[in-house]
């Protein structure tokens, strides 16, 4: 619907609605990244991508969405999940300039949701992902975080995601 305070998501969804198209990076690193780190349902995300894009063919879209975007195949197609925080989006686009959230903030109600959802995704999927050498450094960084920060990440993520479904 594009009814979100997150400028990057809003713009990508509006462009998709208008053109039935989005650049690969918009699909992978904004829409797909959000679906991945927010823990959205694989079947529903696959269906959405197939419905909204004029160039979506099942033989291409399903492996790309399930394997590359959502890492739902456990790493057969992609060697690591394409997950990132707000800093990546800020470096690769100009969406953050006009966003209601602050990409520089890591927690709290004004923080970019990509920032805390990224760490929450890693925490939720630790058993599956920690042994992946391509992201093991991120788990070392997570381990060095204080317990208060980890609790704030979990709290912000829980409340943000709850608001989506309410």
Task: State where each predicted segment sits.
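C-terminal catalytic domain of photolyase/cryptochrome flavoproteins
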Residues: 1-166
């Amino acid at each position: 619907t594009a009814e979100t305070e997150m400028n990057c998501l809003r713009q990508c969804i509006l462009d998709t609605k208008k053109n039935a198209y989005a650049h690969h990076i918009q699909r992978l690193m904004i829409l797909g990244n959000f679906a991945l780190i927010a823990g959205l349902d694989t079947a529903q995300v696959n269906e959405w991508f197939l419905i909204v894009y004029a160039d979506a063919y099942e033989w291409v879209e399903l492996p790309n969405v399930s394997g590359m975007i959502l890492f739902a195949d456990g790493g057969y197609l992609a060697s690591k999940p394409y997950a990132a925080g707000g800093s990546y989006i800020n470096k690769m686009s100009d969406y953050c300039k006009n966003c209601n959230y602050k990409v520089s903030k890591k927690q709290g109600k004004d923080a970019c949701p990509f920032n805390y959802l990224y760490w929450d995704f890693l925490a939720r999927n630790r058993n599956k992902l920690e042994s992946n050498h391509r992201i093991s450094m991120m788990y070392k960084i997570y381990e060095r975080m204080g317990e208060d920060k980890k609790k704030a990440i979990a709290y912000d993520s829980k409340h943000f995601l709850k608001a989506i479904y309410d």
